[in-house]
Amino acid sequence: MKPSISWGILLLAGLCCLVPSFLAEDAQETDASKQDQEHQACCKIAPNLADFSFNLYRELVHQSNTTNIFFSPVSIATAFAMLSLGTKGVTHTQILEGLGFNLTEIAEAEVHKGFHNLLQTFNRPDNELQLTTGNGLFIHNNLKLVDKFLEEVKNDYHSEAFSVNFTDSEEAKKVINGFVEKGTQGKIVDLVKDLDKDTVLALVNYIFFKGKWKKPFDADNTEEADFHVDKTTTVKVPMMSRLGMFDVHYVSTLSSWVLLMDYLGNATAIFILPDDGKMQHLEQTLNKEIIGKFLKDRHTRSANVHFPKLSISGTYNLKTALDPLGITQVFSNGADLSGITEDVPLKLGKAVHKAVLTIDERGTEAAGATFMEIIPMSVPPEVNFNSPFIAIIYDRQTAKSPLFVGKVVDPTR
């Protein structure tokens, strides 16, 4: 039997909030120049990542429109772009085109440079931010990799390489799970449940972040309330509430309320609450241009916002999810991964993606701190997120790259 790659793409978004990184105040001018170059490289791939995000979201909705959806398009795209370094022919073309890159418009070197700088930006230290990504390459100890591939995944994608004895599947699982558990600060344990006996190579990607709301909710105002999953199902949820100044407005073309909430730093969460029966219309209409306008045209108004505390997750078989986007050959016996190793023919045996989203009141460094603001005396609108809504987490520093995309159908599941 031909050996196969078992590829676990792993992701944790532990998010009370999210903040990307800043340069230190005493950063030298050369550092600022370097950051500007990184930003420009990120800008080149940001539109492609945005298109990929919405394409994949719609595909996941098509496969299941009655469950929570949550994934990191940046994480998935990074992992497959890294894998593409070892592919050739149709396999190679399918991956890059499936991720939304037209190589007649952007050079492949620019694609990898964009991901390289994206990862550098995410992993830059900041005292307001816990945002880290990591790539791990786990190689069977008697498998010889092509030097060029090994060098490129290390240099372009900051991937660590580990020698593993895959014939001892329990030990291999322990090594891989330990790498992930450490990288996600213990938030994801036992990611790998089983390994195919023919596995000779595993690629693992994770992303972890946790941040703080710029304007937190007061936990004393959180009360149990109804959340309407659908016309026949209602669940009880802890509902956060705050009367204050919000970037919230009704968009008639989407038949939806749109709420933008900032995290400390350069990240923004966009929550979109459609009118009853308008979720499908919203999902078909939403695109990167509309989101771009929301992020550009910011204004606040007084509002009374109710938002559920939640912790949801999504686990996906990417073979099924990416098939309609044209990424198929890498999973088949016709896969050409000869850029990884010439020892044995390989195919991608398994690609699993997991993401977790947590939202609560926390938003200040000091426990029990109080946030106060002055609001106009006019009657504010009530915006109650007590039915399914869409959530998108954007990193403004990396040219509005969508870090996470999801739909909350049931906050209790």
Curated annotation (Swiss-Prot):
It comes from the Eukaryota. SMART domains: SERPIN (SM00093). One of its GO terms (cellular component) is extracellular space. Its main location: secreted. It is found in: Secreted. The record marks 377-378 as: Reactive bond. The modification Phosphoserine is found at residues 33, 378. One of its GO terms (molecular function) is serine-type endopeptidase inhibitor activity. Gene3D superfamilies: Alpha-1-antitrypsin, domain 1 (2.30.39.10), Antithrombin, subunit I, domain 2 (3.30.497.10), Serpins superfamily (2.10.310.10). Keywords: Glycoprotein, Phosphoprotein, Protease inhibitor, Secreted, Serine protease inhibitor, Signal. Glycans are attached at residues 65, 102, 165, 266. Residues 368-387 are annotated as: RCL. GO terms for biological process: response to cytokine. InterPro entries: Serpin_dom, Serpin_fam, Serpin_sf, Serpin_sf_1, Serpin_sf_2. Residues 1-24 form the signal peptide. Belongs to the serpin family. Inhibitor of serine proteases. Its primary target is elastase, but it also has a moderate affinity for plasmin and thrombin. The reactive center loop (RCL) extends out from the body of the protein and directs binding to the target protease. The protease cleaves the serpin at the reactive site within the RCL, establishing a covalent linkage between the serpin reactive site and the active site of the protease. The resulting inactive serpin-protease complex is highly stable. Interacts with CELA2A. Interacts with ERGIC3 and LMAN1/ERGIC53. Interacts with PRSS1/Trypsin. This is Alpha-1-antitrypsin. It comes from Mesocricetus auratus.
